Protein backbone atom coordinates (compact mmCIF):
# COMPACT_ATOMS: atom_id res chain seq x y z
CA UNK A 1 0.00 0.00 0.00
CA UNK A 2 1.22 3.51 -0.83
CA UNK A 3 2.51 5.47 2.17
CA UNK A 4 1.43 8.81 3.57
CA UNK A 5 4.66 10.80 3.83
CA UNK A 6 5.41 14.28 5.18
CA UNK A 7 8.51 15.89 3.64
CA UNK A 8 9.40 18.48 6.27
CA UNK A 9 11.79 21.41 6.04
CA UNK A 10 14.16 21.88 8.98
CA UNK A 11 15.21 25.51 9.58
CA UNK A 12 12.22 27.78 10.10
CA UNK A 13 9.81 24.84 10.28
CA UNK A 14 11.00 22.25 12.80
CA UNK A 15 13.42 24.63 14.52
CA UNK A 16 13.78 28.38 14.63
CA UNK A 17 15.94 29.91 11.91
CA UNK A 18 18.24 32.67 13.26
CA UNK A 19 18.21 35.91 11.32
CA UNK A 20 21.89 36.76 11.84
CA UNK A 21 23.40 34.23 9.43
CA UNK A 22 20.48 31.80 8.84
CA UNK A 23 22.62 28.97 10.23
CA UNK A 24 22.12 26.81 13.30
CA UNK A 25 25.85 26.44 13.88
CA UNK A 26 25.92 26.45 17.69
CA UNK A 27 23.94 24.46 20.23
CA UNK A 28 22.64 27.61 21.92
CA UNK A 29 20.91 28.53 18.65
CA UNK A 30 18.82 25.36 18.67
CA UNK A 31 15.20 26.25 19.48
CA UNK A 32 12.30 23.97 18.56
CA UNK A 33 9.25 25.53 16.96
CA UNK A 34 6.20 25.66 19.27
CA UNK A 35 4.01 22.51 19.48
CA UNK A 36 6.28 20.58 17.09
CA UNK A 37 6.86 17.60 19.42
CA UNK A 38 3.20 16.99 20.16
CA UNK A 39 2.19 17.51 16.54
CA UNK A 40 4.75 15.07 15.14
CA UNK A 41 3.72 12.42 17.67
CA UNK A 42 0.08 12.74 16.65
CA UNK A 43 0.96 12.69 12.96
CA UNK A 44 3.01 9.51 13.43
CA UNK A 45 0.05 7.93 15.21
CA UNK A 46 -2.04 8.89 12.17
CA UNK A 47 0.37 6.75 10.09
CA UNK A 48 2.31 9.54 8.44
CA UNK A 49 5.97 8.79 7.79
CA UNK A 50 8.43 11.64 8.31
CA UNK A 51 11.22 12.72 5.97
CA UNK A 52 13.37 15.78 6.64
CA UNK A 53 14.45 17.79 3.57
CA UNK A 54 16.75 20.76 4.05
CA UNK A 55 18.95 23.14 2.07
CA UNK A 56 22.12 23.92 4.07
CA UNK A 57 24.03 26.53 2.09
CA UNK A 58 27.75 25.80 1.87
CA UNK A 59 27.70 22.94 4.34
CA UNK A 60 31.17 21.45 4.68
CA UNK A 61 32.95 24.63 3.57
CA UNK A 62 34.78 27.26 5.60
CA UNK A 63 31.59 29.33 5.71
CA UNK A 64 29.71 26.47 7.37
CA UNK A 65 32.01 23.71 8.72
CA UNK A 66 30.46 20.26 8.99
CA UNK A 67 31.20 19.97 12.72
CA UNK A 68 29.39 23.26 13.39
CA UNK A 69 26.31 21.81 11.72
CA UNK A 70 26.58 18.37 13.30
CA UNK A 71 26.54 19.38 16.97
CA UNK A 72 23.14 21.13 17.06
CA UNK A 73 21.68 18.85 14.40
CA UNK A 74 22.60 15.69 16.30
CA UNK A 75 21.19 17.16 19.51
CA UNK A 76 17.95 17.95 17.69
CA UNK A 77 17.72 14.38 16.40
CA UNK A 78 18.41 13.03 19.91
CA UNK A 79 15.59 15.17 21.30
CA UNK A 80 13.19 13.88 18.66
CA UNK A 81 14.25 10.28 19.29
CA UNK A 82 13.84 10.68 23.05
CA UNK A 83 10.22 11.65 22.38
CA UNK A 84 9.65 8.66 20.05
CA UNK A 85 9.71 10.77 16.92
CA UNK A 86 11.55 9.10 14.07
CA UNK A 87 12.45 10.31 10.60
CA UNK A 88 12.69 7.68 7.87
CA UNK A 89 15.28 9.81 6.11
CA UNK A 90 17.16 13.06 6.58
CA UNK A 91 17.95 14.58 3.17
CA UNK A 92 20.33 17.54 3.03
CA UNK A 93 21.60 19.55 0.08
CA UNK A 94 24.95 21.24 0.97
CA UNK A 95 25.19 23.34 -2.18
CA UNK A 96 24.74 27.03 -2.85
CA UNK A 97 22.19 28.39 -5.29
CA UNK A 98 24.98 29.39 -7.66
CA UNK A 99 26.09 25.75 -7.90
CA UNK A 100 22.88 25.02 -9.85
CA UNK A 101 22.66 21.47 -8.51
CA UNK A 102 19.57 19.30 -8.92
CA UNK A 103 19.26 18.34 -5.26
CA UNK A 104 18.70 21.83 -3.87
CA UNK A 105 15.03 22.56 -3.21
CA UNK A 106 12.88 23.02 -5.22
CA UNK A 107 14.80 20.43 -7.25
CA UNK A 108 13.66 16.87 -6.65
CA UNK A 109 16.91 14.87 -6.89
CA UNK A 110 17.01 14.25 -3.12
CA UNK A 111 13.44 12.97 -2.98
CA UNK A 112 13.43 11.19 -6.36
CA UNK A 113 13.58 7.65 -4.88
CA UNK A 114 10.34 8.37 -3.02
CA UNK A 115 8.60 9.20 -6.29
CA UNK A 116 9.24 5.85 -7.97
CA UNK A 117 6.10 3.84 -8.70
CA UNK A 118 3.42 3.97 -6.02
CA UNK A 119 5.75 4.27 -3.03
CA UNK A 120 3.88 7.30 -1.68
CA UNK A 121 0.21 8.21 -1.73
CA UNK A 122 0.41 11.47 -3.65
CA UNK A 123 -3.06 12.58 -2.59
CA UNK A 124 -2.22 12.24 1.13
CA UNK A 125 1.48 13.23 1.20
CA UNK A 126 2.67 16.78 1.83
CA UNK A 127 5.68 19.05 1.81
CA UNK A 128 5.69 21.25 4.92
CA UNK A 129 7.97 24.27 4.97
CA UNK A 130 8.19 28.00 5.54
CA UNK A 131 9.62 29.09 2.19
CA UNK A 132 8.38 29.39 -1.36
CA UNK A 133 10.97 26.79 -2.37
CA UNK A 134 9.12 24.24 -0.22
CA UNK A 135 5.86 24.99 -2.00
CA UNK A 136 7.59 24.67 -5.37
CA UNK A 137 9.16 21.39 -4.27
CA UNK A 138 5.69 20.00 -3.57
CA UNK A 139 4.52 21.14 -6.99
CA UNK A 140 7.50 19.50 -8.67
CA UNK A 141 6.82 16.28 -6.75
CA UNK A 142 3.14 16.30 -7.67
CA UNK A 143 1.95 16.36 -4.05
CA UNK A 144 0.28 18.80 -1.67
CA UNK A 145 1.96 21.49 0.43
CA UNK A 146 1.44 23.37 3.68
CA UNK A 147 3.35 26.60 4.26
CA UNK A 148 4.43 26.78 7.87
CA UNK A 149 3.94 30.04 9.74
CA UNK A 150 4.21 30.36 13.50
CA UNK A 151 1.17 32.65 13.63
CA UNK A 152 -1.18 31.53 10.87
CA UNK A 153 -0.22 27.90 10.10
CA UNK A 154 1.64 26.61 13.13
CA UNK A 155 2.12 22.99 14.15
CA UNK A 156 -1.20 22.85 15.98
CA UNK A 157 -3.02 24.03 12.86
CA UNK A 158 -1.05 21.67 10.61
CA UNK A 159 -1.79 18.74 12.90
CA UNK A 160 -5.51 19.55 13.04
CA UNK A 161 -5.65 19.90 9.27
CA UNK A 162 -3.87 16.64 8.50
CA UNK A 163 -5.72 14.52 11.04
CA UNK A 164 -9.23 15.75 10.27
CA UNK A 165 -11.05 12.94 8.50
CA UNK A 166 -11.31 13.32 4.75
CA UNK A 167 -11.46 9.76 3.45
CA UNK A 168 -12.01 9.78 -0.30
CA UNK A 169 -11.64 7.47 -3.28
CA UNK A 170 -12.18 7.71 -7.02
CA UNK A 171 -12.61 4.64 -9.22
CA UNK A 172 -13.09 4.41 -12.97
CA UNK A 173 -14.08 1.05 -14.40
CA UNK A 174 -14.43 0.56 -18.15
CA UNK A 175 -15.35 -2.71 -19.83
CA UNK A 176 -16.95 -3.65 -23.13
CA UNK A 177 -20.34 -3.59 -21.39
CA UNK A 178 -20.10 -0.58 -19.06
CA UNK A 179 -18.30 2.66 -18.30
CA UNK A 180 -18.48 3.62 -14.63
CA UNK A 181 -17.16 6.57 -12.67
CA UNK A 182 -17.48 6.45 -8.86
CA UNK A 183 -16.39 8.95 -6.21
CA UNK A 184 -16.99 8.44 -2.50
CA UNK A 185 -16.44 10.78 0.45
CA UNK A 186 -16.73 8.70 3.61
CA UNK A 187 -16.79 11.68 5.98
CA UNK A 188 -18.97 14.13 4.07
CA UNK A 189 -22.73 14.20 4.40
CA UNK A 190 -23.86 16.00 1.26
CA UNK A 191 -26.28 15.34 -1.59
CA UNK A 192 -25.17 12.46 -3.79
CA UNK A 193 -25.36 12.42 -7.58
CA UNK A 194 -26.30 9.01 -8.95
CA UNK A 195 -27.20 8.10 -12.51
CA UNK A 196 -27.03 4.44 -13.52
CA UNK A 197 -29.82 4.52 -16.10
CA UNK A 198 -31.94 2.32 -13.80
CA UNK A 199 -34.26 4.56 -11.81
CA UNK A 200 -35.08 2.15 -9.00
CA UNK A 201 -31.41 1.19 -8.65
CA UNK A 202 -30.51 4.90 -8.36
CA UNK A 203 -33.07 5.18 -5.57
CA UNK A 204 -31.54 2.18 -3.77
CA UNK A 205 -28.00 3.55 -4.02
CA UNK A 206 -29.29 6.81 -2.57
CA UNK A 207 -30.50 4.80 0.44
CA UNK A 208 -26.96 3.54 1.02
CA UNK A 209 -25.55 7.07 0.79
CA UNK A 210 -28.20 8.60 3.04
CA UNK A 211 -28.17 5.96 5.76
CA UNK A 212 -24.39 5.45 5.83
CA UNK A 213 -23.72 9.18 6.09
CA UNK A 214 -21.41 9.35 3.09
CA UNK A 215 -21.51 11.22 -0.20
CA UNK A 216 -21.32 9.45 -3.56
CA UNK A 217 -21.10 10.44 -7.18
CA UNK A 218 -21.92 7.55 -9.51
CA UNK A 219 -22.19 7.93 -13.28
CA UNK A 220 -22.84 4.81 -15.35
CA UNK A 221 -23.26 4.07 -19.02
CA UNK A 222 -24.20 0.44 -19.55
CA UNK A 223 -25.69 -1.97 -22.06
CA UNK A 224 -29.24 -1.63 -20.77
CA UNK A 225 -30.54 -2.48 -24.22
CA UNK A 226 -29.61 -6.07 -23.27
CA UNK A 227 -30.65 -6.12 -19.59
CA UNK A 228 -29.64 -4.64 -16.23
CA UNK A 229 -27.15 -7.36 -15.24
CA UNK A 230 -23.85 -5.79 -16.32
CA UNK A 231 -24.82 -2.31 -15.14
CA UNK A 232 -25.74 -3.43 -11.62
CA UNK A 233 -22.87 -5.90 -11.28
CA UNK A 234 -20.18 -3.50 -12.48
CA UNK A 235 -21.56 -0.64 -10.37
CA UNK A 236 -21.30 -2.89 -7.32
CA UNK A 237 -17.70 -3.78 -8.17
CA UNK A 238 -16.71 -0.13 -8.71
CA UNK A 239 -18.51 1.06 -5.56
CA UNK A 240 -17.04 -1.74 -3.45
CA UNK A 241 -13.56 -0.96 -4.75
CA UNK A 242 -14.01 2.74 -3.96
CA UNK A 243 -15.21 2.01 -0.43
CA UNK A 244 -12.26 -0.30 0.17
CA UNK A 245 -9.79 2.31 -1.11
CA UNK A 246 -11.45 5.08 0.89
CA UNK A 247 -11.11 3.09 4.11
CA UNK A 248 -7.33 2.94 3.63
CA UNK A 249 -5.52 0.85 6.24
CA UNK A 250 -8.65 0.87 8.47
CA UNK A 251 -6.86 2.16 11.58
CA UNK A 252 -9.35 3.33 14.18
CA UNK A 253 -12.54 2.13 12.49
CA UNK A 254 -15.18 0.20 14.40
CA UNK A 255 -14.92 -2.55 11.74
CA UNK A 256 -18.22 -4.17 12.76
CA UNK A 257 -21.77 -3.03 12.14
CA UNK A 258 -25.07 -4.59 13.11
CA UNK A 259 -28.62 -3.39 12.71
CA UNK A 260 -32.07 -4.87 13.02
CA UNK A 261 -34.67 -2.14 12.36
CA UNK A 262 -38.39 -2.81 12.54
CA UNK A 263 -40.52 -1.18 9.87
CA UNK A 264 -43.03 -2.62 7.43
CA UNK A 265 -40.21 -5.13 6.85
CA UNK A 266 -37.90 -6.83 9.29
CA UNK A 267 -34.38 -6.41 7.88
CA UNK A 268 -31.11 -7.58 9.42
CA UNK A 269 -27.54 -6.70 8.48
CA UNK A 270 -24.25 -7.75 10.01
CA UNK A 271 -21.07 -6.41 8.42
CA UNK A 272 -17.41 -7.07 9.19
CA UNK A 273 -14.78 -5.08 7.28
CA UNK A 274 -12.50 -8.06 7.69
CA UNK A 275 -10.70 -8.16 4.35
CA UNK A 276 -12.40 -11.52 3.74
CA UNK A 277 -15.26 -11.46 1.21
CA UNK A 278 -18.38 -13.45 2.04
CA UNK A 279 -22.13 -13.02 1.61
CA UNK A 280 -25.03 -14.82 3.23
CA UNK A 281 -28.28 -13.52 1.78
CA UNK A 282 -31.87 -14.42 2.61
CA UNK A 283 -34.77 -12.78 0.77
CA UNK A 284 -37.75 -13.88 -1.29
CA UNK A 285 -39.67 -11.83 -3.83
CA UNK A 286 -43.03 -12.21 -5.51
CA UNK A 287 -42.13 -10.55 -8.79
CA UNK A 288 -39.19 -10.49 -11.22
CA UNK A 289 -38.87 -6.71 -11.13
CA UNK A 290 -39.35 -3.78 -8.81
CA UNK A 291 -39.75 -0.75 -11.01
CA UNK A 292 -37.09 -1.15 -13.70
CA UNK A 293 -34.72 -3.27 -11.59
CA UNK A 294 -34.60 -7.07 -11.57
CA UNK A 295 -35.14 -8.48 -8.08
CA UNK A 296 -32.66 -11.31 -8.78
CA UNK A 297 -29.96 -8.64 -9.18
CA UNK A 298 -30.32 -7.47 -5.56
CA UNK A 299 -28.43 -10.49 -4.26
CA UNK A 300 -25.94 -10.23 -7.11
CA UNK A 301 -25.33 -6.55 -6.27
CA UNK A 302 -24.49 -7.29 -2.65
CA UNK A 303 -22.37 -10.31 -3.58
CA UNK A 304 -20.32 -8.27 -6.06
CA UNK A 305 -20.09 -5.40 -3.57
CA UNK A 306 -18.91 -7.61 -0.70
CA UNK A 307 -16.23 -9.23 -2.83
CA UNK A 308 -14.94 -5.94 -4.24
CA UNK A 309 -15.04 -4.35 -0.79
CA UNK A 310 -13.56 -7.46 0.87
CA UNK A 311 -16.12 -7.58 3.65
CA UNK A 312 -18.19 -10.26 5.34
CA UNK A 313 -21.88 -9.50 4.95
CA UNK A 314 -25.04 -11.13 6.31
CA UNK A 315 -28.35 -9.80 4.96
CA UNK A 316 -31.91 -10.92 5.58
CA UNK A 317 -35.31 -9.35 5.03
CA UNK A 318 -38.89 -10.44 5.63
CA UNK A 319 -42.05 -8.68 4.54
CA UNK A 320 -44.98 -8.63 2.15
CA UNK A 321 -44.12 -5.92 -0.37
CA UNK A 322 -41.23 -6.39 -2.83
CA UNK A 323 -40.45 -2.67 -2.98
CA UNK A 324 -40.19 -2.47 0.79
CA UNK A 325 -38.19 -5.70 1.05
CA UNK A 326 -35.56 -4.52 -1.43
CA UNK A 327 -35.42 -1.03 0.04
CA UNK A 328 -35.05 -2.41 3.57
CA UNK A 329 -31.87 -4.25 2.55
CA UNK A 330 -30.21 -1.16 1.09
CA UNK A 331 -31.26 0.92 4.10
CA UNK A 332 -30.07 -1.58 6.69
CA UNK A 333 -26.79 -2.06 4.84
CA UNK A 334 -26.25 1.72 4.88
CA UNK A 335 -26.94 1.96 8.60
CA UNK A 336 -24.62 -0.94 9.44
CA UNK A 337 -21.93 0.51 7.17
CA UNK A 338 -22.19 3.81 9.06
CA UNK A 339 -21.30 1.97 12.27
CA UNK A 340 -18.46 -0.02 10.74
CA UNK A 341 -16.62 2.88 9.06
CA UNK A 342 -16.88 5.20 12.06
CA UNK A 343 -13.44 6.16 13.41
CA UNK A 344 -13.12 6.19 17.20
CA UNK A 345 -9.40 5.59 17.85
CA UNK A 346 -5.99 5.16 16.23
CA UNK A 347 -5.96 1.41 16.87
CA UNK A 348 -6.25 -1.20 14.13
CA UNK A 349 -9.22 -3.40 15.15
CA UNK A 350 -7.49 -6.72 14.52
CA UNK A 351 -5.28 -8.98 16.63
CA UNK A 352 -3.50 -9.97 13.41
CA UNK A 353 -2.14 -6.47 12.92
CA UNK A 354 -3.61 -6.08 9.44
CA UNK A 355 -7.01 -5.78 7.75
CA UNK A 356 -6.12 -6.17 4.09
Curated annotation (Swiss-Prot):
Q: PANTHER family, per this entry?
A: IMIDAZOLEGLYCEROL-PHOSPHATE DEHYDRATASE, IMIDAZOLEGLYCEROL-PHOSPHATE DEHYDRATASE HIS7
For this protein, the record's InterPro entries field holds: HAD-like_sf, HAD-SF_hydro_IIIA, HAD_sf, His_synth_bifunc_HisB, HisB_N, Histidinol-phos, IGPD_sf, ImidazoleglycerolP_deHydtase
This chain's source organism reads: Baumannia cicadellinicola subsp. Homalodisca coagulata
Q: Where is this region: Histidinol-phosphatase?
A: 1-166
Q: Does the keyword Magnesium apply?
A: yes
Q: What does UniProt give as GO cellular component?
A: cytoplasm
Its gene is hisB
Q: Which NCBIfam families match?
A: HAD-SF-IIIA, hisB_Nterm, Histidinol-ppas, PRK00951.2-1, PRK05446.1
The organism that produces this protein has a lineage beginning with:
Bacteria, Pseudomonadati, Pseudomonadota, Gammaproteobacteria, Candidatus Palibaumannia
Segments carrying the region annotation (Imidazoleglycerol-phosphate dehydratase) are 167-356
Reaction equation(s) it catalyzes:
D-erythro-1-(imidazol-4-yl)glycerol 3-phosphate = 3-(imidazol-4-yl)-2-oxopropyl phosphate + H2O; L-histidinol phosphate + H2O = L-histidinol + phosphate
CDD domains recorded: IGPD
- Grouped into one coarse class, the protein's main location is cytoplasm
Tell me the residue numbers annotated for binding Zn(2+): 93, 95, 101, 103
Which biological process annotations from GO are given for this protein? Answer: L-histidine biosynthetic process
Report the cofactors: Mg(2+); Zn(2+)
Q: Under what name is this protein listed?
A: Histidine biosynthesis bifunctional protein HisB
The catalytic residues are: 9, 11
